[in-house]
Amino acid sequence: MATFISLNQYDLVEVAGVDAEKYLQGQLTCDVVHLAAGASTLTAHCDPKGKMNSLFRLIKISSEQFLILMPKNLFVPLDHLKKYAVFSKVTFQVLDWQIVGLIGEKCGRIQAQITLDIDENRAILLNPTPLDVTFNGDEKQWLCADIQAGLPSLSVETQNEFIPQALNLQAIEQAISFTKGCYIGQETVARAKYRGANKRAMYVLSGETTVTPKIGSEIEMQLEKAWRKTGTIVSAVNFDGVLWLEVVMNNDLEEWTHFRLPEDGSVLKIEPLPYSINS
């Protein structure tokens, strides 16, 4: 049975114009030029220090038209992205389209104008008019699936705090290109790869509890008989009594390390990622 979720946590932004591809190529971590028409990828927009001020899914319609699924929980991310657009033939427009998440059986009878396959079990449907679907899931379910897939997210609490590799973007889809040339923050991102400057990675953890910790807060790690705070929570959702977290920590953790939630002492265990963070 398919689960349909209204993804109200996103804005759909159209980027259009003869300079659209060139402009985005100089702004984003992914290789916009070599992204195939009809394809999508996670990508980041960084500040000059290489810290991410937005993280979103980019969809290429053509070299002159792109769509962005921009999370609403960031502070003016679109203003940052279009800061230099005045010097190019490119426009940004928020579209009033329906954004639907699909989990489970991908029903061929649901004909959306754009269908994005996220993985074997999930898709995003984009349509200018309401689709004939019955919503039987919620945003928490979608976030839970994102976390389980190791797909990161940013929020206002973590905006401009991390370079892309700290959230594993080097290992996800086509999120970072190390061969495309210059873009804002590129020097820091390249240094993290070629000089080993990045010492952090994002881990998925789970535990049974009714608590949902705040984004930007810490968990605790056991050191011999003591516990100390560690990491930064970047995503958190409690679904059916199980807490799922994405936490940025040192990338040299031992497999046997024990973790817990400071709020109630609940045991947290590291879950396997569907990709290698050493990519």
Regions found by a protein language model. Give the residues of each.
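Short amphipathic beta-strand starts and helix->beta connectors
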Residues: 1, 41-55, 85-86, 106-113, ...
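Anionic-ligand-binding alpha/beta catalytic cores of soluble enzymes and soluble regulatory domains
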Residues: 126-206
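Short, conserved charged micro-motifs
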Residues: 19-24, 75-78, 107-110, 129-135, ...
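A common structural junction motif
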Residues: 31-32, 82-91, 133-141, 223-226, ...
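Acidic, proline/glycine-enriched N-terminal capping motif
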Residues: 1-55, 60-64
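The conserved catalytic core of RNA pseudouridine synthases
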Residues: 59, 67-68, 114-127, 161-180, ...
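Glycine-rich, small/acidic residue-mixed loop/short-helix segments
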Residues: 167-174, 190-279
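Acidic, low-complexity central loop/insert segments
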Residues: 3-14, 54-152
